[in-house]
Amino acid sequence: MDDFQEWAQEYERVKKLNAPLESLPTQIKRCKDPATRAAVVAPDDKRMLLRVADFVVSVSYSCFDLYRDQDVTEYCTGFIISSDKINKKARILTCDDIVSSEADANSKVFIHWQYMPDSPIEGKLLFVSIHYQIALLEIPVDVHSVMPQLEIPSFGSYPNYGQEVFTLARDKDLFLMARRGTIMRAQQGLMFRSHNILVDYGLPDCGAGGPVVDRSGDVVGMSLHGSGISAILSISTAISCIDMWTNFGRIARPLLEMRFKNVELLDEPSGSRLGGFIVDRVDIDSTAWELGIRRGNVISFNGHCSTPLPEFEDFLLSYGLAHLQGKHRVADFKLKVCDHDEDVKRHINLCVPFSDVSEVGLDRLTAASLWLGSYTFFFGNVPTTVICMLNCLLYLQTFVKSVAGLVL
């Protein structure tokens, strides 16, 4: 009986050796994200994107789900933009989803990176800008000590209309996803500001905050999405904000209280002979409104006529930098204003103050206030009672913190 059992075991072992293999190295495994395979076809594109992908991370944060009435963990994407070898710290750029109106900005934010053995690691929020929809995080990691052979990707120039670009994202399992598309010659959607440009791919749910890469492998922007629309923030704008905050602790921008469109994107033949920016919106009671600037006017700032809006935004930030350096107390622009219908031109001086478009250490109430301000900017006025109640709560919160500080 023992001999028979030994023979049966040997028979089963040999049978398994001769069985057909179900998983061969040459077989294509089932794709988790078919859109990624469709986006990256050429081998050169794959190699190029993988070099950037080394620095793409997943960012997790807690937020309150109104429908389920409980805290949940959400994910977005970020990417490493710098590493400090001396202080052993790295900075990560991501979107402002981590401090949205539903998120508690005082809750912990975690960074998931495939090269960190103790991943996830808690990230420190340095600042957030609701205006530019960016957030800067810091982690106690020296990238070059973890992976000495890695080189942080270079930053490219402004993304251009009609340009083909890729974007990268990582989900909660660190699975890499890619999308490919073309920058659209469409005007900005309701969820985005003048300096954002639209793109024709759809981002995955975790794709906001990921890098946008051109065909040369340079990072040219950061991905944003809202209401099913994908957009790009120019990397030059993000870096300008980071440099300004690093050196001065603030991000100064002229308070124009206007939104613009590029006149070159007009479908009408007159778009070719007019130079400047179309005023898409001007706030009532603003300085521009008092000077007679209205929706539909075509204006140029200090001779800037045909500048793409992302480049124009950097021009405005250069005024903010000069202000922080003590060169300007206010922003003084020389405008040429054209009436689109009547072709009437006039020259005026627009003098406006600066605003700080960065926030540090937001709590849930302050984030709600900023969200309400963004809602008002995009969709119009909200009930005055709501604004008054929120302001009262903010003042009460400040008073309580002051009293608590005195007691302590």
PLM regions: where:
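C-terminal cap/linker of serine protease catalytic domains
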Residues: 2-19, 23-29, 45, 215, ...
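Short glycine/Trp-rich loop-beta-loop segment that forms part of the substrate-binding cleft
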Residues: 2-12, 16-19, 98, 110-117, ...
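Catalytic-histidine neighborhood of serine endopeptidases
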Residues: 6, 18-35, 48-55, 75, ...
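Terminal peptide-recognition signature
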Residues: 57-59, 78, 90, 94, ...
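PDZ/PDZ-like domain segments forming the peptide/carboxylate-binding groove
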Residues: 77, 201-211, 261-301, 305-307
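Conserved PDZ fold ligand-binding element
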Residues: 88-93, 216-220, 224, 288-316
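Flexible, gly/ser-rich surface segments that form the specificity/activation loops bordering the active-site cleft
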Residues: 101, 127, 146-195, 204, ...
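C-terminal, low-ordered peptide segments at domain boundaries
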Residues: 145, 151, 332-392, 399-408
